[in-house]
């Protein structure tokens, strides 16, 4: 399952018209998720073999820069060899399990300590060295579907993620990217929830393949989803106040009337179409470099060596 604002962080620089202070502040967030093409996941045989790991930092650094010449390498190689007696599939599975464990409780990287970040970077480097899909854009069907953001080192996204520390106001429920390789489109989406409603902010974009690992993304429009109001009021039969039990049964009729009114309002508002805002600017595009890709895990690198780890919807890595 890259920036212009917090969302634009994942791999793109997006500028959109400012319909309102609130809308414009949130529209940039979805533009953040970057991505690259995807190849089919090759069959990994259990036969042991030695692997040479290459650091991909060099490729990632120029994601937003000019496309380098084909013969320009730029990245120092960090060699890591896999034990000859360890099957590649088992080794990759073990690394992914360790990565999942390292990301637990980090809130997409917001709460990660320096030690955890160092561990995550080390695990990512080892996975990149064993990337089963060295040329993602040559097999885009593997990139198809919805990807959920599990971790990022992109600091400009943290203010948005930090809203989750105020559960009484707004909480970021999910940041995702949905890719359609047949139509060459991508949608970045952030879902928010509050005490009385849920909504989403997303961006739609087109992408073009520019190299075996890189794609160019150009955003077309921003979308503010119609708020979905909470239309159910749960009222307990009684509660305790200063040691005294208060019976709320006589109030159920009153709250039932309020709930019916709320349901009517919710249906009316939820039935309205989402607000679409065209993005018409030359700066609403970005590069994305994919450094690891299989059928359940995607790792991308962005400007300033930012890292994005995404899990495929339905993957066991999410649970």
From Swiss-Prot:
The protein's UniProt keywords, in alphabetical order, are: Chloroplast, Plastid, Transit peptide
Q: Write out the annotated subcellular location.
A: Plastid, Chloroplast
Q: Name one GO cellular component term.
A: chloroplast
| Entry keyword 4Fe-4S | no
| Record flagged with keyword Transit peptide | yes
Where are the stretches annotated Disordered?
A: 1-20
Domain of life, per UniProt, equals Eukaryota
Recorded hits in Pfam families, A to Z, give: PAP_fibrillin (PF04755)
Organelle targeting sequence: 1-54
User: Where is it chiefly localized?
Assistant: plastid
Family, similarity comment: Belongs to the PAP/fibrillin family.
- What protein name applies here? Probable plastid-lipid-associated protein 2, chloroplastic
Which organism does this sequence originate in?
A: Oryza sativa subsp. japonica
């Amino acid at each position: 399952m890259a920036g212009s604002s917090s969302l634009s962080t994942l791999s793109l620089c997006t500028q959109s018209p400012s319909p309102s202070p609130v809308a414009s502040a949130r529209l940039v967030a979805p533009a953040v998720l970057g991505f690259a093409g995807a190849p089919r996941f090759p069959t990994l045989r259990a036969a042991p073999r030695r692997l040479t790991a290459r650091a991909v930092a060099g490729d990632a650094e120029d994601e937003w820069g000019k496309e380098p010449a084909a013969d320009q390498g730029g990245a120092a190689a960090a060699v890591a060899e896999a034990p000859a007696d360890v099957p590649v599939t088992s080794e990759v599975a073990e690394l992914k399990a360790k990565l999942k464990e390292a990301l637990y409780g980090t809130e997409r990287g917001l709460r990660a300590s320096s030690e955890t970040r160092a561990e995550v970077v080390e695990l990512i480097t080892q996975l990149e060295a064993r990337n089963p899909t060295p040329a993602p854009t040559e097999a885009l069907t593997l990139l198809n579907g919805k990807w959920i953001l599990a971790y990022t080192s992109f600091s400009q996204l943290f203010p948005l993620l930090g809203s989750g520390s105020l559960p009484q106001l707004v909480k970021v429920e999910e940041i995702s990217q949905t890719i359609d390789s047949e139509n060459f489109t991508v949608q970045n989406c952030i879902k928010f929830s509050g005490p009385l409603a849920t909504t989403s902010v997303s961006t739609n974009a087109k992408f073009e393949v520019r190299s075996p690992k890189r794609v160019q993304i150009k955003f077309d429009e921003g979308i503010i989803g119609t708020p979905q109001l909470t239309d159910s009021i749960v009222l307990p039969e009684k509660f305790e106040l200063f040691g005294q039990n208060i019976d709320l049964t006589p109030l159920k009729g009153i709250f039932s009337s309020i709930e019916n009114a709320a349901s009517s309002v919710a249906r009316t508002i939820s039935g309205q179409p989402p607000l679409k805002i065209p993005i018409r600017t030359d700066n609403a595009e970005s590069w994305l470099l994919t450094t690891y890709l299989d059928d359940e895990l995607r790792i991308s690198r962005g400007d300033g060596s930012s890292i994005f780890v995404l899990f495929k919807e339905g993957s066991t890595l999410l649970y």
